[in-house]
């Protein structure tokens, strides 16, 4: 299967909110032609559009007062600003009435309070609310959801286990999950996410949990 001639690959740091915003709106962006124009070209002949916002940072893994300011800023830019900017851009660029599905990958940390995750949890809660607001706006042929994927064995988990226990009280819990085989594989989780996106249940609730389906 050959990729569309309208496909252009762009390398951009999603944690740099200013750079992403400039690329989406400004033809003078150092990343080349403006992203808004590229999106319109890419989506021009689309029969259906799917946007998945998965990129995220879990740092700072630390209680308030022990967090690095740079990590707070980076996490909010990557976890919140980037998904909102991309969702807004795709909504603006999609051809009229073409079906659009927007999936944010959320977290149980956005729905329950955990010591040491005031930044990560807050950022994931923001995506839950963004999905709710999209539903409240009643965009025609648009479905949106924020899905908590469960606890998955990824590099993010390794980063959590490497955190400072004195600053992150939950470190021991995640070390135990790894040692006791309590983590889902990335491949199994990806397959479940794909099945969820293709199901009739996608978009019926703004904040969903993959463990409620399997």
Give the role of each language-model region.
Residues 4-18:
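Rossmann-fold cofactor-recognition segment
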Residues 15-43:
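Conserved Rossmann-fold cofactor-binding substructure of NAD(P)-dependent oxidoreductases
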Residues 28, 47, 57-73, 92, ...:
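Conserved mid-core segment of classical short-chain dehydrogenase/reductases
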Residues 45-49, 93-108, 140-143:
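Active-site loop of short-chain dehydrogenase/reductase
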Residues 87-88, 132:
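A short, exposed helix-loop element centered on a Lys and neighboring polar residues
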Residues 99-126, 131-139, 148-152, 158-161:
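Catalytic loop of short-chain dehydrogenase/reductase
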Residues 146-149, 154, 162-214:
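C-terminal helical subdomain
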